[in-house]
Amino acid sequence: MSSSTGKVIIKLPKTSIPYKYVEPVLIEVDKLVNHEELVDARLRELMDKIRSENAVDMPIVVTPIPGTDKYLIVDGHHRWAAVKALGYRKIPCIIIDYFSQDVKLKTWLPGIIGDVKPVLEEAARRGLGVAECRYSVDTSGDIDAKLLEESSFIVLGRDLCRAISGGVEGQKIVSQVLNELNMKGLFTLVYYGELSEALEDLKSGWLHYLFIRKSLTKEDVMRYVRNGGVYAPKTTRHILPFYPAKTYTPLDALR
């Protein structure tokens, strides 16, 4: 995925997750809660697609938020936002058991090919602390849990370790910095679905810097959302037992 000014690479392991048809249910958009911030370009793209097809091509995946009458959006934030922005009242959904062992949660890890110095300088300019740390590619598995909790990211290079402060809220600032500088063409932005692959690329020299953060649990996500929190884009990576097959729900059914 790339644009005229910024290049983004998504690296995921190969999977054999099947597509499955599930009859969607229509849920009011105001009863759905997103847990990640939106990317404007993706939202506009989906609004145009939905308008041109006069339908929502596939249902979003949601789960009940315990103790409320609302649902957490597990997958489909931008489709939900597009339908809502277009003025429709409902959206097709598949309801899952979030805490089932069949539903996995992992965390996206950003990395860059290029110079990390502008990122660290801009993060500091926006109020985040940047401190030296003592970890390396070979000792990344030993990063102190308290340091991970308090940091937005631990940045590792072959000869560099920096802890950026801010915790989960700081991740939003760093994510914004990464996206802005990437769009200026300062570096290639890489998103990893698996830490092991990221570390291999870092060791080989293909990747220059990796941004490691605390892994989230499903309980973390539910607690954060119930407290009104919204993560940075590309934070959670949910792995479902199936991909929803396309159903093409007509827009007239969503009024």
Curated annotation (Swiss-Prot):
CDD domains: ParB_Srx_like_nuclease (cd16400). The keyword Kinase applies. GO terms for biological process: chromosome segregation; positive regulation of sporulation resulting in formation of a cellular spore. It holds the Pfam family ParBc. It is an enzyme of class 2 (transferase). InterPro entries: Chromosome_partition/occlusion, ParB/Sulfiredoxin_dom, ParB/Sulfiredoxin_sf, SerK/SbnI_C, SerK_C. This is ATP-dependent L-serine kinase. It comes from Desulfurococcus mucosus (strain ATCC 35584 / DSM 2162 / JCM 9187 / O7/1).
